[in-house]
Each structure stands twice: as structure tokens, then as C-alpha cells.
Design a protein with these regions (language model features):
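Short, conserved phosphate-binding/catalytic loop or strand-edge motifs used
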Residues: 117-120
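Acidic, divalent-metal-coordinating active-site segment for phosphoryl/phosphodiester hydrolysis
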Residues: 152-164
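Conserved non-catalytic scaffold segment of RNase H-like nuclease domains
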Residues: 1-114, 124-128, 132, 136-150
Length: 164
């Protein structure tokens, strides 16, 4: 039986959803038996607030670009349909899941309940005392990432799928 997994990443307006920060991009890439299938989900979102300057420096998604994008509630069903019951593979899962579950709550939806593999926690177990951010893992495992000048959720999921 084929095993379906989804590599998932978000970009956000800041680092803490409890301070009102929101998701501004979702990227997800499908794996079947640990191989990229080509199926993906990407959505930019209007957070109805500005990004913190540090977050903007990381992702480069401006208010002007995001203002015409849908809100999370408008795309929640399509996002959940793409995920299905697949295991989620996320680098620093508590961060992304905190934001996504908050967005789902605001949209009147149940939180994500899929199995989750946190690749950051896994990397810390495998490489204690070393840097384990995505760029460091790319260098360690010889995964090409020179085209990654800014963080983008879909780009980061594609890179993480290669690392995984």
C-alpha cells in the first residue's frame, strides 16, 4: 500500500500567532512512498495586517502583493482537501502547526490531527550541537539551494522534500 505524505511550510507576518500574527503563504508538496509526485498546493493569503519588518525581510511578501489575495477562511476547505489524511512533514512543526491550527480555529474548522514528522527535531537528534536550519541541512546533504534568496513556503517545501 502506497504511503502518502505532505511536506508543508508556511510564511507568516511574525513569529507568534498569539500576538495576532497570521499565515500569508502555505506551500505543500505531495510525496508517495517518499517520492515527489508533482502534486502541490500553494496559496498566498491576505492576513489583514502588516508583516513585522524582520518577517518581511525573510519572505519579501509585501502588503501590496497580499492585499488582493483571499483570506484563510476562503481557502481552508481546499487546503484541507489537499492534505487529506497524509502524514505531515514539517521543519519546526510546532511553529507551523500553531499558526495553521489558529487559522483553522478562526475559520471555524477543527485542528489538524494528522501524524506529523518534525524534521527539525529529527535533525537535532541526528546532528546534536550543529546548526539544523534548512540551509545547513542542504549543505550537509548536498541539496542545491542557491536559488533560495528569500524564504517562500512552496520553495522551502520542495527543498525540504529533497533533504528528507
Amino acid at each position: 500500500m502506497a504511503v502518502r505524505q505532505v511536506v508543508l511550510d508556511t510564511e507568516t507576518t511574525g513569529i507568534d500567532w498569539k500576538q495576532g500574527h497570521r499565515v500569508i503563504e502555505i506551500g505543500a508538496v505531495e510525496l508517495i512512498d517518499r517520492r515527489v509526485t508533482g502534486a502541490y498546493y500553494q496559496q498566498y493569503l491576505n492576513p489583514q495586517r502588516s508583516s513585522d519588518p524582520e518577517a518581511l525581510r525573510i519572505h519579501g511578501l509585501t502588503d501590496e502583493f497580499l492585499q488582493d489575495q483571499p483570506g484563510f477562511a476562503e481557502v481552508a476547505d481546499a487546503f484541507l482537501e489537499f492534505l487529506g489524511d497524509a502524514e505531515l512533514i514539517i521543519h519546526n512543526a510546532p511553529f507551523d502547526l500553531g499558526f495553521l491550527n489558529h487559522e483553522l480555529q478562526l475559520a471555524g474548522k477543527a485542528p489538524l490531527r494528522q501524524a506529523v514528522m518534525d524534521t527539525l527535531a529529527d535533525a537535532r537528534r541526528r546532528h546534536p550541537g550543529q546548526k539544523n536550519d534548512l540551509d545547513s541541512l542542504c549543505r550537509r546533504y548536498s541539496v542545491e539551494n542557491r536559488h533560495r534568496e528569500l524564504h517562500g513556503a512552496l520553495l522551502d517545501t520542495r527543498i525540504l522534500a529533497e533533504v528528507y
